[in-house]
Amino acid sequence: MSGVTGERPFSDIVTSIRYWVIHSITIPMLFIAGWLFVSTGLAYDVFGTPRPDEYFTQERQELPIIQDRFEAKNQITEFNK
């Protein structure tokens, strides 16, 4: 059972001038916003990941791998010292 949904066909939307005026501005702005989000370091702060120079400290040069899931909180505290 097929019917008409009343929506505009995709070919009409993509070939309209209005579509390209709007998207020629918004799509590049999304890329620029993403680039700024990462390049300024805000992504590290928002998601809580260490910056590339913070993975290893002078005191700890080994990989911070959690060995026991029941003692994970204590191990993470040790890694952060």
Curated annotation (Swiss-Prot):
Segments traversing the membrane: 21-35
Which terms are listed as keywords in the entry?
Answer: Electron transport, Heme, Iron, Membrane, Metal-binding, Photosynthesis, Photosystem II, Thylakoid, Transmembrane, Transmembrane helix, Transport
Please share the entry's free-text remark on the cofactor. With its partner (PsbF) binds heme. PSII binds additional chlorophylls, carotenoids and specific lipids.
Q: From the Swiss-Prot or TrEMBL record, what is one GO molecular function term?
A: heme binding
GO annotations of cellular component type = photosystem II reaction center; plasma membrane-derived thylakoid membrane
- Give me the residues that bind heme, please: 23
**GO terms under biological process:** photosynthetic electron transport chain
Q: Where in the cell is it found?
A: Cellular thylakoid membrane
Q: How does the record classify its membrane topology? A: Single-pass membrane protein
Q: Which cofactor does it need?
A: heme b
In this UniProt entry, which cysteines form S-S bonds?
A: none
| Entry superkingdom | Bacteria
Gene3D superfamilies (alphabetical): Photosystem II cytochrome b559, alpha subunit
Its assembly, as annotated, is: Heterodimer of an alpha subunit and a beta subunit. PSII is composed of 1 copy each of membrane proteins PsbA, PsbB, PsbC, PsbD, PsbE, PsbF, PsbH, PsbI, PsbJ, PsbK, PsbL, PsbM, PsbT, PsbX, PsbY, PsbZ, Psb30/Ycf12, peripheral proteins PsbO, CyanoQ (PsbQ), PsbU, PsbV and a large number of cofactors. It forms dimeric complexes.
Biological role stated in the UniProt entry: This b-type cytochrome is tightly associated with the reaction center of photosystem II (PSII). PSII is a light-driven water:plastoquinone oxidoreductase that uses light energy to abstract electrons from H(2)O, generating O(2) and a proton gradient subsequently used for ATP formation. It consists of a core antenna complex that captures photons, and an electron transfer chain that converts photonic excitation into a charge separation.
Q: Which family does it belong to?
A: Belongs to the PsbE/PsbF family.
Its name, as the record gives it, is: Cytochrome b559 subunit alpha
Annotated source species: Crocosphaera subtropica (strain ATCC 51142 / BH68) (Cyanothece sp. (strain ATCC 51142))
Write the gene name: psbE
